[in-house]
Swiss-Prot record:
This is Beta-mannosidase B. Exoglycosidase that cleaves the single beta-linked mannose residue from the non-reducing end of beta-mannosidic oligosaccharides of various complexity and length. Prefers mannobiose over mannotriose and has no activity against polymeric mannan. Is also severely restricted by galactosyl substitutions at the +1 subsite. It catalyses: Hydrolysis of terminal, non-reducing beta-D-mannose residues in beta-D-mannosides. It comes from Neosartorya fischeri (strain ATCC 1020 / DSM 3700 / CBS 544.65 / FGSC A1164 / JCM 1740 / NRRL 181 / WB 181). In contrast to clade A beta-mannosidases, which are likely secreted, clade B proteins appear to be intracellular.
């Protein structure tokens, strides 16, 4: 008997170009996990591919094969134990050799692999571990050539990527570079044990009244020799053991224990309650000796997707612990192209930003990776719901038998690895593969329910999404909802707004509609939509080295924007709405204003629709983050610097939010003639679970003078509908013949005497307004060691006051509209006495 021991193989590696067999070709690897681009940079063989045009200088790496090698000593292995070589992730085509003998061949980046090397390590002393990483870029092309009959329809990247189980964005996307990584991208170690807990998971049954829960813990045990093992299960809350049970392990290597929990503390998404985590542990014992112990945290909660017929079609929204949740949030792409560089701390900072921005759901997009455990741990601990795609994106995937088997193993492994996370509330089969099917005219008959027949069509990938994956989820995580694709809705056209989820790209892409009408373009759940914006100047300074290149249309800036047609799209939305500028800093700011306004118009309207029989169940913007310093749809850039849209979304997602808007007048199709009258509406959206009383004020303030142009409207003792929308004015009228000067509609709401939310509706477009000479005043009214409070006032309405984003500094609010008679406070944390004040900018400055 021996207690499980782990020996990390993170040091002592070297690598070389596989074709260069000379002894001096070997270069040191600083640490594993790593990928080849990191190791080449560490050896000064590659420049930072994120700077300038260096991505092009790194392209040679994409077509190379690489060999990694280390030498280790055989670990001490007591009698009756085994030695296992464990890889948590190999990227991607890897032939593993131990002392010259092939012990493993890998072709799937998303799989962990384990090899029993007990016999291979019988000899004492040094052993050589060598891994040949074949070129995935070239292998993919070979695989594609082998199946010329398959329709390789796809968006983004080389279509051959569909043949390889590797992160699809490595082939390049419309927001990221082409960097074909290879290497030991997750941990590698030796394990010595006589028996181990191979898996630990729970199944939770929560009573409908939430007063009790039944927690069943399961353990799967592997042992070298048969014998009587016992499993001691413990259940803990906040570090305190609350239950314990010891049970024998069955002959087939399983054990389970059931715990009854009275008055359980539930897991809630943030804003709805505490994200309480219980911990289950199992200690594997033999003759009272502990051989292995494993612990996992989980939550007691229910989660479902509610799909029911209604007046709008068929609903699609999330319900957690019986409470309907409007899921405002973002889509997530991998946070780096060089994946091992993402630390647990960096993951947590991203999720903390989600909470700071009042976003309740993050969608792990299907062209990236099944994320690191630390990502999901942060979501669990901070109360962020996870929409989890399987890793299929924008293509018609082949279904060769060996590929299907690899996909099955991949999906089983990752569903089992992640099933204990209470944050994961949905598994989704793919990203936009059904859109590829539609656009390529591939065969799809929803009424055909014979999976074997799907494999014979020109859209065989349907078998993956409607047969293979749902069976895996049902077997290994039966309480988690499965959705065949995103977007998808009952086999109907993916753009159908009455059912399922939809990706609404007719702002920016498609018909390039006005962002002011975004809310009219949505569906039952809007899981993608977006608008590009430049990152802050400090980020551009990182990747643009030459000062002469710092102008809006420079070659290097265009190179760092991978979206097709971005020039004309950015220009269109700028010219339609704003007074354009040629200096880079102002251009950056103007693109950010457009993005912030776009997100505000979408979220504000869709959240209002939540109150109309759950017409809109949620909105996940594209995208939260970047994988390199770039110009993209991200609302927070690669360096975790929020763009103005981040703050605009946070305000709309306030637990109680007031909204005001006048009807859209499309100036661009009416010869810019102003309307004679305009209708306006006023409402309150609330995610509170109880009715509250509030006072709502609406003022009409001149843009030119800051004075009120008509009598304000005040609604006192308003009963705010819980978890819904309270419409206060639906037929308001502005007569522009009487009130001819441009004016804003400024709304505020007080609850229990506290001002809780604001909204300001502006005349559109901004380019017709003179926004200079605002009389803005910003005063520092308090200061401590690392916190300042600013008081902001103005004589005339100010649009989109944006503060500088500085490393280590967090701002409570930015991208703000300031109106006379409504001073606002902003708290700045991380700015120390003596530090230079944050710069700021507003529209028209």
């Amino acid at each position: 008997m021996s207690k499980l021991q782990q020996f990390p193989l993170s040091k002592g590696w070297s690598f070389r170009d596989s074709e260069d067999t000379s002894e001096d070709a070997w270069m040191p690897v600083p640490v594993v996990p790593s990928v080849v681009h990191q190791d080449l940079q560490a050896n000064s063989k590659l420049k930072d591919p994120y700077i300038g045009f260096n991505e092009l200088e790194a392209r040679w790496v994409n077509e190379k094969s690489w060999t990694y090698k280390t030498v280790f000593q055989k670990p001490a292995a007591p009698a009756g134990s085994c030695i296992v070589l464990a890889f948590d992730g190999l990227d991607t085509f890897a032939k593993v050799k131990l002392d010259g003998n092939v012990i493993l061949e890998n072709d799937n980046m998303f799989l962990a692999r384990r090899v029993d090397v007990t016999k291979a390590l019988e000899a004492e002393g040094d052993h050589v571990l060598e891994i040949d990483f074949d070129c995935a870029f070239l292998r993919a092309k070979e695989l594609r050539k082998q199946d010329p009959k398959h329709n390789w329809a796809s968006f983004n990247g080389d279509p051959s990527r569909l043949s390889v189980r590797k992160a699809q964005y490595h082939w390049g996307w419309d927001w990221g570079p082409v960097l074909m990584t290879a290497g030991i991208w997750r941990d590698v170690r030796l394990e010595v044990y006589s028996a181990r807990v191979a898996d630990l998971w729970t199944e939770v049954q929560l009573a409908s009244d939430h007063q009790s829960a039944q927690v069943t813990a399961f353990a799967e045990v592997e042992s070298v020799h048969s014998g009587s093992h016992r499993a001691c299960f413990t259940l803990s809350l906040h570090g305190q053991e609350i239950a314990r049970e010891e049970i024998g392990v069955t002959e087939n290597g399983t054990a389970k224990a059931t715990f009854d929990v009275k008055e359980p503390s539930l897991w809630w998404p943030h804003g709805y309650g505490d994200a309480t985590l219980y911990e289950v542990s199992v200690s594997l014992r033999k003759e009272q000796e502990e051989l292995h112990k494993v612990s996992k945290k989980f939550g007691i909660r229910t989660a479902e997707v509610v799909q029911r017929p209604d007046k709008h079609g068929k609903s699609f929204f999330f319900r957690v612990n019986g409470v309907d949740i409007f899921c405002g949030g973002s889509c997530w792409i991998p946070a780096d192209n060089l994946l091992p560089s993402i630390t647990a701390e960096r993951y947590r900072k991203w999720i903390e930003l989600m909470v700071h921005g009042r976003q309740v759901m993050i969608r792990v997009w299907g062209g990236g990776i099944y994320e690191d455990n630390s990502f999901y741990d942060a979501c669990d601990e901070l109360g962020v719901l996870v929409w989890q795609d399987f890793m299929f994106g924008c293509g018609n995937y082949p279904t060769w038998p060996n590929l299907l088997e690899s996909i099955r193993k991949e999906s089983v492994y990752n569903v089992r690895r992640l099933r204990h996370h209470p944050s994961i509330v949905i598994w989704v089969g793919n990203n936009e593969d059904y859109q590829v099917q539609e656009q390529a005219g591939l065969t799809y008959n929803y009424e055909d329910k014979d999976p074997e027949s799907w494999l014979k069509t020109d859209f065989p990938a349907r078998y993956i999404y409607e047969k293979l994956l749902p069976e895996v989820v049902q077997e290994f995580s039966p309480s988690t909802f499965y959705h065949p694709g995103s977007p998808w809705g009952d086999g109907k056209t993916t753009s159908d707004p009455t059912v399922g989820d939809m990706h609404q790209w007719n702002v920016w892409h498609g018909t390039q509609e006005k962002y002011q009408i975004f809310d009219t373009l949505g569906g039952r759940f809007n899981s993608e939509f977006g608008m590009e914006a430049f990152p802050h100047m400090s980020t551009i300074d990182y990747f643009v080295e030459n000062e002469a290149d710092k102008y809006p249309q420079s070659h290097v800036l265009d190179f760092h924007n991978k979206a097709d047609g971005h020039e004309r799209r950015i220009a269109t939305y700028l010219v339609e709405n704003l007074r354009t500028a040629t200096d880079l800093e102002t251009h950056i700011y103007l693109t950010q204003v457009v993005q912030a306004e776009t997100m505000m118009f979408g979220y504000r309207g869709w959240r209002r629709q939540w109150g109309d029989e759950r017409h809109c169940g949620g909105a996940l913007l594209w995208q939260l983050n970047d994988c390199w310093p770039t110009i993209s749809w991200a609302i927070v850039d690669y360096f975790l610097r929020p763009k103005p849209a981040f703050y605009a979304v946070a305000r709309v997602l306030n637990p109680i939010a007031v909204g005001v808007r006048r009807e859209h007048h499309d100036w661009s199709v009416t010869h810019a003639q102003p309307p004679k009258t305009s209708k306006f509406e006023l409402w309150v959206a609330s995610s509170r679970q109880q009715e509250v009383q509030g006072t709502v004020e609406l003022r009409f303030l001149s843009v030119n003078t800051g004075l009120e142009v008509r009598e304000r409207i005040v609604h006192e003792n308003v009963s705010i509908v819980p978890n819904g929308t309270t419409n206060l004015i639906v037929d308001g009228l502005i007569d522009h013949r009487v009130h001819s000067e441009p004016h804003v509609l400024a709304a505020r709401i007080w609850v229990d005497g506290q001002l809780v939310a604001r909204d300001v509706d502006w005349p559109q477009p901004f380019k017709y307004l003179d926004l200079s000479d605002r009389g803005l005043e910003i005063k520092k009214i308090s200061e401590s060691e690392d916190e300042q409070t600013l008081l902001i006032s103005t004589q005339k309405p100010v649009k989109c006051l944006v503060f500088e984003e500085r490393e280590g500094v967090r701002i409570s609010d930015s991208a703000m509209d300031i109106v006379p008679g409504d001073d606002q406070r902003v708290t700045i944390k991380g700015l120390k006495p003596g530090d230079a004040p944050l710069k700021y900018k507003f529209l028209g400055q």
